[in-house]
């Protein structure tokens, strides 16, 4: 589970993703919002870093997924089923969703670590498509939070590498 942020801007992030990952982002955003809204059956994923990084900022995740949908539609990717699920969840939960920025958003170093580790991971997933992100592999900001992770998860701060 992951919400890829190769840019601090959701619209730019959406435009940078390959179609496979772009479409997957829409589903994963629904799953994350579902967990954060307490609507998910069972307790799975509630402690996953991709869920925790958006806790309290569900409206920001909503904006992110809307950017993914707009980009997907522009590529001819069908999103109707996921959109229906998202809209139903929004209708039920909008008033309880938080609008605070994630903890990393206003910290330049943390934001650069998030963006850079996401670019490096995308490069690893598809080096041909993400060749323009190859530089991220050697960036000083490509420093995952711990030795077990590929990403910088703000939620893991304080763990030993």
Segments (PLM) and residue ranges:
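Expand to "…catalyze enediolate/carbanion chemistry for C-C bond making/breaking, isomerization
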Residues: 1-161
């Amino acid at each position: 589970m992951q919400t890829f942020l190769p840019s601090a801007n959701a619209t730019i992030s959406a435009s940078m993703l390959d179609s496979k990952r772009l479409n997957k982002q829409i589903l994963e955003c629904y799953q994350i919002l579902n967990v954060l809204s307490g609507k998910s059956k069972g307790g799975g994923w509630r402690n996953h870093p991709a869920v925790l990084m958006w806790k309290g900022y569900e409206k920001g995740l909503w904006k992110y997924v809307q950017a993914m949908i707009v980009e997907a539609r522009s590529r001819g990717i069908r999103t109707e089923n996921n959109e229906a699920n998202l809209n139903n969840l929004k209708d039920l939960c909008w008033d309880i969703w938080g609008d605070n920025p994630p903890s990393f958003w206003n910290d330049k170093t943390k934001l650069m670590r998030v963006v850079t580790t996401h670019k490096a991971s995308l490069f690893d997933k598809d080096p041909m498509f993400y060749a323009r992100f190859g530089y991220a592999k050697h960036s000083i900001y490509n420093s995952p939070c711990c030795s077990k992770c590929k990403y910088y998860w703000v939620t893991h701060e304080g763990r030993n590498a």
